[in-house]
Each structure stands twice: as C-alpha cells, then as structure tokens.
Amino acid sequence: MQTKLYVLYGGKSVEHEVSLKTAYTVIQSIDNSKFEVFPIYITREGLWCSPDKLNQEGLQLNDLIALPKHRSEAESIGQVLMSQFALPGKKVVLPLLHGSYGEDGTVQGMLELLNVPYVGNGVLSSALTLDKAISKQLLAQAGIHQVDYRVYRYDQWLEDHSKVLQKAEDTIGYPCYVKPASLGSSIGISRCHDKQELVAGITEAFKYDNKIVLEREVIGREIQVAVMGNEKPLASLPGEFIHDHVFFDFESKYMDKQLKMSIPAHLSEEITSQIRQLAIKAYHTHNCSGLARVDFFLDGKGQLYLNEINALPGFTNYSMYPVMWERTDGTRYSELVEKLIDYAIMRHAEKQSIQYTR
C-alpha cells in the first residue's frame, strides 16, 4: 500500500518563494509507486488549501499555488488536517516551510499534537536553530568557536541608538554584518563599513525581527556540511560555493547562474575531519533529528568558526545539501528524500513507546 505523503509548503514568510521551489523539486522526485502525494499549500496570508492527490506528470511550478482556498485560517487548518489524518493507512508529513511559522517549531508543535510522523527537526531543535541569538549561546556553552557577536532587541535600539552603536563599534568593529535573529536565505542581512551603513543595516534587520545579531566579518572561506540522522547522525564531505561576491546575499544564492560548487571542498584531511566532527557536535547540541546543514567560516590562518546551523536547508536539486550527499556516498535526490522519510517514521515510532501516564 502506498504511503500518503502530505507536503506542506508556502507559508507566511519572506522565504515563501524558496519554499515553493523546494516543494516543486521534492514533489517531482517522489516515487509514485511508493507514495501518494497530497500538496498542502499555505498562502502568504496563512490560508491552508485543500489537498488533492497530485498528478506529478507535467507538473509546473504554478500548479502548486493553483489550489482552492478555505475561508479562514482556523477553519482551513482543522478541515485540511483533521479530515486527512483521520483516514486509515500509513501517512507522513513533509514540512517544506522556510523561515517564520515553518522552521521555528510552530508547525512542528501542531504536528506533534496531531501525533503524525513528520520529516525534519522537532519543536525544540527547530526553535533553537532558527533563533541565531539563542543558538550562539548554546554553541558557546558547548565550547564551539564562533565569531565575535552582539545581540540587540528592538526596545534597546529605541531606547538609546547611540549606546548600541558605540558598543557595536567598540566590540565588533568594521566591516560587520547585521542579521535578523530568526531568518534564513540571507534575507535582511547587511554588510556595514561605517556608522551610517550600520544604522541603515540595523534599521533594515529590524523590519524582519525584533531581535538582531551583529557579527564581526571573517575574511576567508565559507564551508558547509550536511548532517543526517537521529541519535547517530552522519556528516557529509564539506562543500563550498565558488563565487566572486564579497557578500553572499539572497540574490547571489538564488539568482547567480555562474555559481559553482566545490564538493568536496579542497581542505586538508585534518580540517575536513574537524569540520565533520564539529558539525555533528552542533547537531547534538541543538537536539536535531532528520537533517540540518552546518555552516562554517575558515580564515586564512586555518581557524574555524561555526557560523550557523540550518534545520531546513535549501533543498532544490541544485542546493548544497542534497548535492553534498550525492558526492559523499552516491545518494541520489529521490533516495535522500526517502531516507529522511524513514528517519521521521523511526522517530515517531520511538516516541510512541514513551509512557505518558503513571
């Protein structure tokens, strides 16, 4: 019997378009002899769309948003999920929601309450990894080296601009980066060379979050590692993008047709081993399961800095995460998706054995 696979995508997030591209690639790769695919599109306004069995043949990207909408968010969530998950048969949810309300533990909490297996990280690890400020505190406690950083809330900025700016200049200096604490895909990030640019960067970052992170710039390479698994995760060979951009922003990541990958990255065996071990340590530190991508900086002196851990990395067929696995152990894209589904089912089965009453 086919497993019913419910693919969640879209969502109330500035990373909505990234989610659509990811869902399109994943759905096309699914083996329809094993899975019956039901797309659940969430609009930018938060409305959930009725899932119908999808015809993968001839699928176009626009087909993923041409679905009927319900009248209200509360009604639609109840009708869509409860009616579907009450049906007999094996079922798994594949959340492909990037950023707010999808990668922060919100949807994961709902799926936990519904008691259905879902791919990827749980409530706690999703929340921890998306909040860069909290994540950095965890990494520091674990003794993992990071770049110098400061965290500011919006109320601190409103209370005293000059105090924030002075502290940032004294402790971080220039050039520096300003980031929203809880966004991915390099959205809302600015590279600043002086006070004027820093003010503009802080203002921009606060458009997307009420907490921001300032980081000292590291001159060097950006290295990425894919991690997969539950209690005993595996780390891929490291990879890096080869590009001429000083600042690898959203447009560079998703629009640059000249972007090239180097997998495995040209590193010594010692550095390669160190990166893979640190990636798994960070994965455990955040209580991750299923998958994550861990990003590092490597400066000219050979010093490694863990930049961030991404609980739902880019997952199109040209994204670094799936390509790193293909070049590490030959795992093809469709096989990778099935492995992640298997990890979700195993984690769910383990949770069912936990006793919740005395």
Please place each PLM-identified region on the residue numbering:
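C-terminal active-site "lid" helix and adjoining low-complexity regulatory extension at the edge
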Residues: E270, S289, L298-R358
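Phosphate-binding site of ATP-dependent enzymes
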Residues: S190-Q277, L298-Y305
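Active-site nucleotide/adenylate-binding loops and adjacent lid/helix of ATP-dependent enzymes
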Residues: Q2-Y9, S13-V14, K21, S83-L87, ...
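Residue-level detector of anion-binding/catalytic polar loops
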Residues: E36, P117, H145, K211, ...
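A glycine- and small-aliphatic-rich helix-loop capping segment at beta-alpha/alpha-beta transitions
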Residues: G109-Y118, Q196-V199, R327-D329
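Short, basic/aromatic recognition patches
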Residues: I280-H284
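ATP-binding N-terminal substructure of ATP-dependent carboxylate-amine bond-forming enzymes
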Residues: M1-V119, V123-L124, L128-L130, I134, ...
